[in-house]
Amino acid sequence: MKKQLVGFVKYFIFWLTFFLHAKGLFVAWNSDQSALLSGAEIGGIFWHGLIMDISTACYLLLLPGLVLALRPLLAAAFINRFIKLYTILLLVVTSLLTVADLGLYPHWGTRVNVTIFNYLDDPVALSASLSIVDVLLGLLLCGALVAGFLYFFKKLFPDGIADTKKVSWFYLPLQLFLVATLILPIRGGLDTSPLNLSSVAFSPKMYVNQAATNYMWNFAKSVEKRKRLANPCMYMAEDESQRVFKEFHSRDTLSQRPQLIKLKDGRQPNVILIILESFSNKVIAPLGGLHGVVPYLDSLCTKSTVFTSFYSTGNRSDRGISAILGGYPSLLSTSIMVYPEKSSSLTLLPEYFNRKNYHTSFYYGGDINFYNLKSFVLQGNYKRLVTKADFPSELGRMTKWGVPDGYVFERATQDLKTDQEPFMKTIYTISSHSPFDVPFSRIQGSSHSDRYLNSV
């Protein structure tokens, strides 16, 4: 029994070693870009990407783990043969994708994903990116990876993983428990948000964050996303929709643009952008909402510029943020935030301020890895990020989503005393997100509506 438990751990090390080698190959293959990186950035590619490599390795352990749990019922020879064939098959698949990733990245600028299948039936389009020499070198490298790691596998398990001795029935629930615990590293930990591309992002440089990503994880995720990309908006014929779009695009609906801010002596104004989570005109009295829910906002409306015909671009936070910061309209079935290879082509709002020598910062009291938010804001080149990790841990545990907004605003206000001008500060709130567990109670009641009104 001990041999199988040790073997299970060694099998995890086997796949983790494979992915670390693949990452090293990627960095070496793209030496023209890697040579421009510092030692800390190269090390960060491996360190920050380790959580995704571990997650992917644990995915590959699920099926062998379940088969090993059946050792009291199945012969050791059968289990060892099954795991060996499973390993050979996966080595071929992962090695082919490794080579495809290396060959296509310099041309496409993205890690290998499901779109590669779009070109398998079109060799002419594929040959535009790859030469015959590339293909031959790729096949040679693929064969070397399979042969090298198959040799490594035989060295690790000369007699197989399954114990040839009699195994107690006690082993079955123990092994099943071990397989169940794999869910934790697969998910990426106990944080609110599961593992995503933001979990490994740590640099404003797109290449660095892409290199930290596990290519197999990225490929599997792209397969999952592709299932959700059917167009839900086919309400008219293609030619009619094009005509309507072009007609709308050619209009200038605002004949005279008002000057909202009058600058004094040519000074650049400081800018604070507050993104309010789950807000609505229904709680703001001057916009036709309830009275007395948000008295300070109501007061601001009487002495500010208020847009009374302003409509949401979407119904999810990630789609709102991509519209506010990236000027990108909402996609009904997905969000551009989860496609870094696409969002990297956007020029985000803070980048315009950076060009004017502003000091830019982003404040968010929650887990910034949630829904790929970190990767997105890093693309905007914010000079400073303040997140849940920058607050005492007890504050981060006060609510489900993280640090209550009050403490985040206190931190932002405190930073104003030392911020160099001009500055552009973005504050994204979380307390008004379900389940609305704010640390005070101004509006009584336990219904969903009461808790929401209390949170805003």
What function would you assign to each model-found segment?
Residues 18, 113, 123, 213-216, ...:
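Alpha-helix initiation and N-capping motif
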